[in-house]
């Protein structure tokens, strides 16, 4: 099962999405033992996102474990006022490579599967994205999160370089700003 509809948690005002549920088996002396693995993403639609991978004998337990792990592994993403990326970014995790670039207002989220779920819960509305290599949902999620972690806002760049924000904005292009 891949990419189910969103569920909203009223406890923390977080948006939760289930990406995949896999049935896995372990062969033992008496036959096979089945268990389930769930991959989920959680975000506040305002620049915070986390993902979790949970395993259990029953599907609801696996999903619950994944959601708990996702809530504990949340990171902050610097968003543009136009709800898009600050700049083009590349994310790599094992065999999965993803490329994301900012899009103009009204474009929407042009991305597939697991990447789309992350971008929706983080609060990005306009982005163009492409996955290369491995399309394994776990690798795509990790590559996307790695890319989002490495994104820098103009304020962060100015502070790191010891320059003024005006200097950075005038001499470098940050999504048309």
UniProtKB/Swiss-Prot annotation:
Q: Which Pfam families match?
A: Ribosomal_S5, Ribosomal_S5_C
Domain S5 DRBM, which positions? 14-77
In the record, biological process GO terms are: translation
User: Does the keyword field hold Methyltransferase?
Assistant: no
Check the record and name the SUPFAM superfamilies matching this protein. Answer: dsRNA-binding domain-like (SSF54768), Ribosomal protein S5 domain 2-like (SSF54211)
A Gene Ontology molecular function term of the record? structural constituent of ribosome
Whether Nucleotide-binding counts among this entry's keywords is no
Alphabetized UniProt keyword annotations: Ribonucleoprotein, Ribosomal protein, RNA-binding, rRNA-binding
Q: Which domain of life is it from?
A: Bacteria
CC annotations in GO: small ribosomal subunit
This molecule's function is given as:
With S4 and S12 plays an important role in translational accuracy.
What NCBIfam families does the annotation carry? rpsE_bact (TIGR01021)
Domain notes for this protein: The N-terminal domain interacts with the head of the 30S subunit; the C-terminal domain interacts with the body and contacts protein S4. The interaction surface between S4 and S5 is involved in control of translational fidelity.
Family membership: Belongs to the universal ribosomal protein uS5 family.
Its subunit composition reads:
Part of the 30S ribosomal subunit. Contacts proteins S4 and S8.
Task: Write down what this protein is called.
Answer: Small ribosomal subunit protein uS5
